[in-house]
Amino acid sequence: PCDVWSVGCIIFEYYMGFTLFQTHDNREHLAMMERILGPIPSRMIRKTRKQKYFYHGHLDWDENTSAGRYVRENCKPLRRYLSSEAEEHHRLFDLLEGMLEYEPTKRLALSEALKHPFFSVLQLQPAPKAWDSNRDISR
């Protein structure tokens, strides 16, 4: 499941041209995740070993700091990054939402992601033979 998350982040980067979570700070990373993907599920907050990042079941994050303002101004809900209203763009973001699901048990497996409607336009056909072994080339 974590590999699928990483692939989702990479696909987003290919689409937009920049990384989804541009930070090395753990707390800021969590704030970006909440801003882009919505609140972290309370069950996950209760089970984390990183309780220092949370207070009363919510991310302990001050939006009035320079980092807080940066996240507020530069991160937006995932679907707001759509650059087109075309159907294939909506299918891509549906795929990304499945790949970036917080809950690992609800996140798309790689095999499921590959069967997603976004990829349906890629009709898998047998590769053409590069070499026909019955052909006589001796002349």
Regions found by a protein language model. Give the residues of each.
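Hydrophobic alpha-helical patch in the C-lobe of Hanks-type protein kinase catalytic domains
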Residues: 30, 93-96, 110
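Regulatory extensions flanking the kinase catalytic core
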Residues: 98, 105-139
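Activation segment of protein kinase catalytic domains
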Residues: 18-25, 107
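Conserved catalytic-loop aspartate of Hanks-type protein kinases
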Residues: 3
